[in-house]
Amino acid sequence: MAVVEIEEIPALLQSGQTIAGLDLGTKTIGLAVSDLGLSFAHPRPVIKRVKFSIDAQVLLKALDADKVGVIVIGLPMNMDGTSGPRVQATRAFVRTMQPLTDLPFVFWDERLSTVAAERALIGMDVSRGKRADRIDSAAASFILQGALDRLHSIRRSASDDYDAG
């Protein structure tokens, strides 16, 4: 399926489906999955990158196991809002994944998600070695939680509009 806007997610999700968050690294893919209520992001084990065909197969299997209906993927914009090589790599990953799945993708600005994830892991007194193993999934959780919070805000706004009308 295509890349969609976050506002389109409620119409695309079927009952019992979750939303996945991805943080693409050069060596790993961080993965997080929402609960069925679409309120909380839960980190999953990172996927160690080998080559695209293997990475895609492992990722799609994990997404299927969690009944994912939409993928939110972090878009690593520069702090000034411009696109750099990592944005291009993320867009290329999505373009290459699209023929392999019917799942829609949503790009989500991930600026500072890795920094926030690392601070959270440090705050939990996770050792440097374990932080390296968990950082991408923790960042995926921050990306997904941001998207879930936005969805909640959209639903609340729609409910307020309905109540007012």
Swiss-Prot record:
EC numbers on record: 3.1.-.-
Gene Ontology MF annotations: nuclease activity
Family: Belongs to the YqgF nuclease family.
Organism lineage: Bacteria, Pseudomonadati, Pseudomonadota, Alphaproteobacteria, Hyphomicrobiales
PANTHER family xref list: POLYNUCLEOTIDYL TRANSFERASE, RIBONUCLEASE H-LIKE SUPERFAMILY PROTEIN (PTHR33317:SF4)
Top-level taxon in the UniProt lineage: Bacteria
Subcellular location: Cytoplasm
GO cellular component, as recorded: cytosol
Biological process (GO), any one: rRNA 5'-end processing
InterPro entries cross-referenced by the UniProt entry: RNaseH-like_sf, YqgF, YqgF/RNaseH-like_dom, YqgF/RNaseH-like_dom_sf
SMART domains for the chain: YqgFc
Name of the molecule in the record: Putative pre-16S rRNA nuclease
First-tier enzyme category under EC: hydrolase
Physiological role: Could be a nuclease involved in processing of the 5'-end of pre-16S rRNA.
Key word Nuclease present: yes
Keywords attached to this entry: Cytoplasm, Hydrolase, Nuclease, Ribosome biogenesis
